C-alpha cells in the first residue's frame, strides 16, 4: 500500500465521493483488497488531517507567544495555551513535529517565563518579606530594609517586575512614605533635645525647663514607632524625670 501524505488529500477525497454513494450491491463488484484499501486510506487521511490541525494550532499559539526577552507575567494564558497545543503535537502517536524554529522559540520563551517568575520570587522572599506587615508600623529596625527593597526592585528587569503584584509594590511605597514621615518627625524632636542642658545633674534654669517642656511636648506627639528613630531619647527622659520627679 502506498504511503499517504497530505498531498494525497484531493485524491482520497475524490475516491470517497465516488465510493460513499455506492449501494451495498454495487460495492460487491469491488474486491476485498479494494474495500480494505479504501477504508485504510480514508482512516489514514483523517489521521493526517487531525495531525495537521494539531500542528497548525500549536504553531499559531507559539507565534502569538512573546519572545524570551519580551514575555511577562501577563502572558501566562498564552503560555498555557501554547503548552497544551505543543504537548498534543509532541505526544501524538504519529510522531508529529512543528517548525523547528517555532519549537525553539517556545522552549526559550517558556524557560525565560519561569526564570523571570523565579527571580521575582527570590526578590519577594529576600526583600519584600523583610518589610513590616503593617506599613504604618515602620520602626528604625526597617530603616535599611525599606530602601534596600526599592533599590533591588529598580534593578529588576521589566519582565521580572511584571511578576511582582501591584499590591506588593503599593505596600513598599507605603512603607517608604511612613519611613520618610517618621524620620522627619524624629529629626524635629532630636533638634529640640539638642537644646537641652548637657549635664543632667546640673541645676536647671528656667530656660532649661522651658526647653525640656518644648522637647517633651513634641516627643509626646510621636508614635511608639517614630520614637525608635530618635538619636538621644534617653537624655530627654533623664532631663524630664529630673525636672518633674513626680511625673
Label for each model-derived stretch:
Residues 1-247:
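Beta-rich interaction/scaffold domains
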Amino acid at each position: 500500500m502506498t504511503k499517504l501524505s497530505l498531498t494525497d488529500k484531493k485524491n482520497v477525497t475524490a475516491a470517497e465521493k465516488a465510493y460513499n454513494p455506492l449501494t451495498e450491491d454495487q460495492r460487491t463488484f469491488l474486491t476485498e483488497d479494494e474495500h480494505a484499501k479504501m477504508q485504510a486510506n480514508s482512516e489514514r487521511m483523517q489521521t493526517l488531517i487531525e495531525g495537521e490541525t494539531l500542528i497548525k494550532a500549536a504553531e499559531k499559539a507559539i507565534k502569538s507567544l512573546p519572545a524570551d526577552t519580551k514575555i511577562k507575567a501577563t502572558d501566562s494564558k498564552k503560555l498555557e495555551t501554547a503548552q497544551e497545543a505543543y504537548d498534543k503535537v509532541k505526544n501524538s502517536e504519529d510522531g508529529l513535529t512543528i517548525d523547528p524554529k517555532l519549537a525553539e522559540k517556545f522552549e526559550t520563551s517558556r524557560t525565560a517565563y519561569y526564570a523571570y517568575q523565579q527571580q521575582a520570587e527570590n526578590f519577594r522572599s529576600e526583600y519584600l518579606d523583610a518589610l513590616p506587615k503593617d506599613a504604618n508600623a515602620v520602626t528604625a529596625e526597617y530603616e535599611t530594609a525599606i530602601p534596600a527593597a526599592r533599590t533591588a526592585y529598580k534593578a529588576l528587569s521589566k519582565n521580572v517586575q511584571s511578576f511582582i503584584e501591584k499590591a506588593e509594590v503599593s505596600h513598599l511605597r507605603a512603607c517608604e512614605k511612613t519611613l520618610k514621615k517618621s524620620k522627619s518627625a524624629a529629626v524635629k524632636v532630636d533638634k529640640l533635645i539638642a537644646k537641652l542642658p548637657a549635664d543632667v545633674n546640673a541645676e536647671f534654669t528656667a530656660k532649661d525647663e522651658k526647653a525640656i517642656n518644648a522637647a517633651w511636648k513634641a516627643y509626646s506627639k510621636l508614635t511608639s514607632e517614630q520614637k525608635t528613630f530618635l538619636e538621644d531619647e534617653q537624655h530627654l527622659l533623664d532631663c524630664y524625670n529630673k525636672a518633674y520627679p513626680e511625673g
